[in-house]
Each structure stands twice: as C-alpha cells, then as structure tokens.
C-alpha cells in the first residue's frame, strides 16, 4: 500500500512539473485569493517561479493592469464549491486542475457539476495523500471530526511537500495576519463566510512556522 501511494504521489509530481517551466522545479509560487495592492516585486517573484499554483476562484493580471497577482497559472487547486472567476476557465486546457475532496470523507457526493467543461480533465487528489496528513500536521482528525484545511492551505502544503528542495513563494493568504477572521474577502467576486470545517488560526501558525527553515517567503 505504501509503495502504491508513493508511486501515485510521484506520478502527480511529474505531471504537475510538466505544466511548469521544466522537470527540475526549484521554485514554486502558491497564490491565494485575498485582495492585494499592486506590487511589481511580488508579481515578478510569482511569475519567475518554475511552477505557479492558483486556488479556486483566482485572479490574474491582465494586459495593462498594474502588476499585482502575476499572470501565470500552471496548476489549479479547487473544490466542488468553486465560484469561478473570469480567469478560471480562460485557457483552462493549458493547466493542471487538481480537485480536492475532503468532504468525500463524510457527506460530499462523487459528482461533477454540469456547468464545468466536459474536457476540464481534473485529477482527483486522494485524501490519503493530502487531506489526512495535512490535518495531522494541524492537529486535526478529518475522519472523526469533519474538520480540514482550506483549499488554499492544501495547495501550499502540497507544493511544499511535493517539491521539498524548492523555494516556496506564498502570497494572497489573509489568515496569515488575520487568523480570527470569520469572512473571506476575495480579489474577484463576493465575500463569503469562513466554513465551519476550517480552523484557520492553526493554518496561520503552520504558514508562519514554514518561514523558519529559510525556504519559504510569505509576501504581503
């Protein structure tokens, strides 16, 4: 079983790298969806990475925009509650879409929304490879408690654990400085509540702990 899981994770790593700049991934950017002020330095740091990961209803810089969010999206983490933005399906055939399914541990049906493109080609990420070990790092029990990390934290944890020798650039995560918030504000689209299944103060602490080893940068 262990060998099967290792092979599955290795295959996903190779697949993800094929959507970036090359097989040798030495830098990864993971961008969440909080509203950001323009920053040419941050946008350049994101777009200069070997692999750029986005989350759910993400936003990209368009032609003529002040550099803020960056313009690349190689891998997209998302869930069935997706609120698609104008950028999500634009050029979707050139991206790897990774569908996280923590709710399948309890109540979520194994169905695909009819409004998604039939050729989206999403890869379903095994909970044994992502949800459960990440929850363990957070001190949560997803199987017994019905609690799990946000999709954004899943994306960042996956990037960090899948490419352990790469530098990690993280931007767009409001809970790093606002761990007690109860609503999400988004770079595009309406705000919404923080789901009751999340414990974002624990996620905030996890992100801040990553900075200590010197290979993770959290951009304001």
Pin down the residues of each PLM region.
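Metal-ion/cofactor- or nucleotide/acyl-coenzyme-handling active-site neighborhoods
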Residues: 1-220
